[in-house]
C-alpha cells in the first residue's frame, strides 16, 4: 500500500526569488507528500552540493538539472519501493549519486525526494510528520532562537557578526514564546526607528541597522527586552551566530566593522568577554570552520556555561561531528537538512550529538519556502531548540505557526523546552 508509484519534481522559487526544487511523491494508496528544499547564503565548504544549472537562465541559478534527475534517474531507481523504508531509500539515492558530497545528482534533488517520501509515508499511516518520524516520545516543543538583528553576509551594514537572536526561555509554552518574541521584535523596531536607523528586514526577517559593533547591537536588544517588559538573563536570553568563517583571512579574524584584526586566541577571548558581559547562552560558529585550535580555545574558555554551536564546523555531518567530539570542541550541532542532503543522515547527526551529550539545534536556511518540515523535525527529534528567523516574513512564520499547531495537537502531552536548554 505504501509503494512509491510516482515522483514529480518542479522548479519553484524560494524566499530570495531564486529557484529551488519541490518534489511530490505519490504512493499506491493515493497518499502524497510534498517537500520544498531550502538554500543557504553563507555555506560551509564541507556541505553537500546543490546542483545549479549555470548559463544565463536565472543568472545561472536554475535547478532544471536537479529536477530532471528526480523525474528520471532517481524515480527509475526507487519507484516501486516501500516509502516506509526511509533509510534504505536514502542509501540507494546516495549510492546512485556516487560522489562524497552528492554533487552529481545534487543534494537539492536527493533531499527533496527524501523529505517528500517521509511526508507521504506519514500521510499513509494517518500520522502527523513529527509523530511518524519521532515516534510516541516526540512531545518537546523547541525554544525558538529568533534572529532580530542581522549583519555579516545577511545584511548590507558594518556589523561583522551575522545574527543576534533572542531566546524566550521563560515562556510557559511555544505560543507564549512566539508572543514574547514578537513583542520584543516590535519594541526593537520602535527603538531603532527612534534613533534614526533603517528598519527594513533582511533575508531572515531581522533588522539590519547601520551599527558599528556587536556590543552596539546587543545594547539595543537589551533595551528592547526591558522595554517590552521582560528581564534579560531571566525571561529572555541572547544568542549569536558569528559566521566567523566569512571574516577569517590568512589565519586571522578581520572585524572590518569594528576596525580590528584578531589572532584566534584573541577572538576567543573577545567572545568570552561578550558572554560574561551579556546574557548570551549560545554562540554559533564563533570560530572558523577549519580553525580547530581556535574552537578548542573557545570551548575551554566558555564551554561549561555557554552553548557553542558548530554549523560550518560540522555541516550536519556525523563524521565531522565525531571528530569534534573526540577533540572536545564545541558542545552543540546546528542541524540543516540541506547541508547533508537526506532525512536519515540528518536524524543520524542529531542522534550522534545526543549520545555524546551535545545539544542539537534544528535550523532553516536564509533562502526558505513556505515548507514547514523543520518544525515537525524539531519536535520529532526532541532537540529542544529551533532557529527559524525573525517574527516577519511568511517563509519564517510558517514554521512558528506549525509549532503552534503541533503544540495544540499534542495537548497536555506537550512540553516546552524552556530553561532546560541552559548550560551550567
Curated annotation (Swiss-Prot):
Cell compartment(s), UniProt: Cytoplasm; Secreted; Cell surface
One Pfam family here: Enolase_C
Cofactor note: Binds a second Mg(2+) ion via substrate during catalysis.
GO CC field: cell surface; extracellular region; phosphopyruvate hydratase complex
Catalytic center residues: 204 (proton donor), 336 (proton acceptor)
Substrates-to-products reaction catalysed: (2R)-2-phosphoglycerate = phosphoenolpyruvate + H2O
Primary location group: cytoplasm
Annotated keywords: Cytoplasm, Glycolysis, Lyase, Magnesium, Metal-binding, Secreted
BP GO annotations: glycolytic process
Biological pathway: Carbohydrate degradation; glycolysis; pyruvate from D-glyceraldehyde 3-phosphate: step 4/5
Entry EC number(s): 4.2.1.11
Required cofactor(s): Mg(2+)
InterPro entries: Enolase, Enolase-like_C_sf, Enolase-like_N, Enolase_C, Enolase_CS, Enolase_N
Family assignment from sequence similarity: Belongs to the enolase family.
The protein's role, per its UniProt record: Catalyzes the reversible conversion of 2-phosphoglycerate (2-PG) into phosphoenolpyruvate (PEP). It is essential for the degradation of carbohydrates via glycolysis.
Protein name: Enolase
Organism from which the protein derives: Agrobacterium fabrum (strain C58 / ATCC 33970)
Amino acid at each position: 500500500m505504501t509503494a512509491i508509484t510516482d515522483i514529480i519534481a518542479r522548479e519553484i522559487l524560494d524566499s530570495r526569488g531564486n529557484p529551488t526544487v519541490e518534489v511530490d511523491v505519490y504512493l499506491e494508496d493515493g497518499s502524497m507528500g510534498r517537500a520544498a528544499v531550502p538554500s543557504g547564503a553563507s555555506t560551509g565548504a564541507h556541505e553537500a552540493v546543490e546542483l545549479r544549472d549555470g548559463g544565463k537562465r536565472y543568472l545561472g541559478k536554475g535547478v532544471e538539472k536537479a529536477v530532471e534527475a528526480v523525474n528520471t534517474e532517481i524515480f527509475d531507481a526507487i519507484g516501486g519501493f516501500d516509502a516506509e523504508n526511509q533509510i534504505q531509500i536514502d542509501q540507494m539515492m546516495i549510492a546512485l549519486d556516487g560522489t562524497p558530497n552528492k554533487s552529481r545528482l545534487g543534494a537539492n534533488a536527493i533531499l527533496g525526494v527524501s523529505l517528500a517520501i517521509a511526508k507521504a509515508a506519514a500521510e499513509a499511516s494517518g500520522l502527523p510528520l513529527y509523530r511518524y518520524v519521532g515516534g510516541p516520545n516526540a512531545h518537546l516543543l523547541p525554544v525558538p532562537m529568533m534572529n532580530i538583528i542581522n549583519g555579516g553576509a545577511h545584511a548590507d551594514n558594518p556589523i561583522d557578526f551575522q545574527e543576534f537572536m533572542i531566546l524566550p526561555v521563560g515562556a510557559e509554552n511555544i505560543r507564549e514564546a512566539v508572543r514574547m518574541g514578537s513583542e520584543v521584535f516590535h519594541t526593537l523596531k520602535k527603538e531603532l526607528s527612534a534613533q534614526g536607523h533603517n528598519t527594513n528586514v533582511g533575508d531572515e526577517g531581522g533588522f539590519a541597522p547601520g551599527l558599528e559593533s556587536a556590543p552596539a547591537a546587543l545594547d539595543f536588544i537589551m533595551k528592547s527586552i526591558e522595554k517590552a517588559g521582560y528581564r534579560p538573563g531571566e525571561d529572555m536570553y541572547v544568542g549569536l551566530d558569528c559566521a566567523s568563517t566569512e571574516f577569517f583571512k590568512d589565519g586571522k579574524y578581520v572585524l572590518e566593522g569594528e576596525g580590528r584584526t584578531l589572532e584566534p586566541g584573541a577572538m576567543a577571548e573577545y567572545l568570552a568577554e561578550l558572554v560574561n558581559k551579556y546574557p548570551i547562552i549560545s554562540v554559533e560558529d564563533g570560530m572558523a570552520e577549519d580553525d580547530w585550535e581556535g574552537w578548542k580555545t573557545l570551548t575551554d574558555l566558555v564551554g561549561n556555561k555557554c552553548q557553542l554551536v558548530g554549523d560550518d564546523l560540522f555541516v550536519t555531518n556525523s563524521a565531522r561531528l565525531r571528530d569534534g567530539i573526540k577533540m572536545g570542541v564545541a558542545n552543540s550541532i546546528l542541524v540543516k537538512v540541506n547541508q547533508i542532503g537526506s532525512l536519515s543522515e540528518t536524524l543520524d547527526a542529531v542522534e550522534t550529538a545526543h549520545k555524546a551529550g551535545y545539544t542539537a539545534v534544528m535550523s532553516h536556511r536564509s533562502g526558505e519556502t513556505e515548507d514547514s518540515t523543520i518544525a515537525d523535525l524539531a519536535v520529532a527529534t526532541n532537540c529542544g531548540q529551533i532557529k527559524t528567523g525573525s517574527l516577519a516574513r511568511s517563509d519564517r512564520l510558517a514554521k512558528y505557526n506549525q509549532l503552534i499547531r503541533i503544540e495544540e495537537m499534542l495537548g497536555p502531552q506537550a512540553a516546552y523546552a524552556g530553561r532546560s536548554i541552559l548550560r551550567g
